[in-house]
Amino acid sequence: MSCTALGSAEEIEQAKETICAVGLGTVGLPLAVAFAASGLRVIGVDRDAQLVDDLINGRIYHCDPHLASAISSTARQPCFAATLPRPGMARIYILAVGTPVNAEHRLDGDQLDAAISALITRLRPGDLVIMRSTVPIGTTRAVSDRVAAAVGDVDFACCPDRSITGDTFREIQCLPQIVGGTSPRAQARAAELFARLGVEIVAVENVETAEAVKLIGNVQRDVLFALSNEIAMMCDGSGLDVHHVIESSRRGYPRHVLPPPGPVGGPCLTKDAFLYAEGLKPHGVRPKLALYAREVNAGVATHAAEFISRQAAMLKTPIVAVLGIAFKGRPETSVVDASLAGKLRAELGALLPQAVFRGWDPVARSDAVAALGFWPCETAMAAVVDANVVVLANDHPAVTALPFAALAGTLGRPAMIYDLWGSGRGVGCALPEGVLFRAFGGHNGCARPDVR
């Protein structure tokens, strides 16, 4: 819906609360729809005019199983615009803009700064601004001080998003919501707002605590994945099978928490350790474990690329097919930002400059696949025909369910299937001659003929 459907400013002023969600990506759009479904009037704003036009015309590219149906079935649908509403049309603003890191692994605050600069021209004393974006500790208060100097008394709260990409709309309506404010009034207003979603409110003592809660949640996941991935690299060097090691240690043992090894990508986990470190630096603290874990996980692509390049080095023009371009497959997502596939393409391209790269993903858009340097293919079969290397790069069910033996029959010779997730573990024992199967954490070869 376009914002022209809202009616006059006077009519909007009569509404109890009008929310303006700034940023309509994987965080902002589901939240805007959830609040609209709760009965609130919602204005969704994004500076990407094409995205706004797509939303107005019902074109939704988020891979979220509940989002599209929620938008169409919500009686009071959010309206969408490329510019902020006039002063007074909204009294609550939610910042959900992107907060990536730059080449120096520090916050790239361009989107946030632009949003704040625009907001200052719209805010009035007594408005409420909620930081939904993931930011370094101390950012929300710094933004609050900046706004106060320009506008006056504006309430600020930090209510971070902790949902999982691909299932955000459902999770924001069931996960406990962290709420921290710059004042008791700001916290109470933000808590009242999120209570409309029917979730438990976890009130914390200030905005810094709320920022920290979000960051350490992702950092602890990154650390656990890093331990599994370091074990996988150890197994590659010592001839062991990482899945056999981890599964055996897990069986019947109640204190085992290790996840399976595999790529760690996406727009959140790849940056949050750095944002965590940035917020702690003014206090003289360096989170060594968090930063080392990030280094380990970032090194998975390099580890895989070096192994693959050694296997394909003798080929004049190897064809490399990467299956699963999005940064993860479960829950499925179309997001390719910071995916292992993209980094693997860059590193293999440097090691095998003569290679041809094809890419296939069951949900990511072909233009997004092409933007990473792949020739996009419509089917997995089209991607692997005559290929010398096939990389299983995410764990989407459509990837893990592929008939590897049938696909292997279409490969060039010699060929290798390289599995980064353990999805086809054991399949190497049934492949035709000339086709090698290797897995991350199992470079020594197939340990057990127990899968397909």
Where do the model's predicted regions map?
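Structural/interface elements that position substrates and couple domains in central-metabolism enzymes
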Residues: 2-452
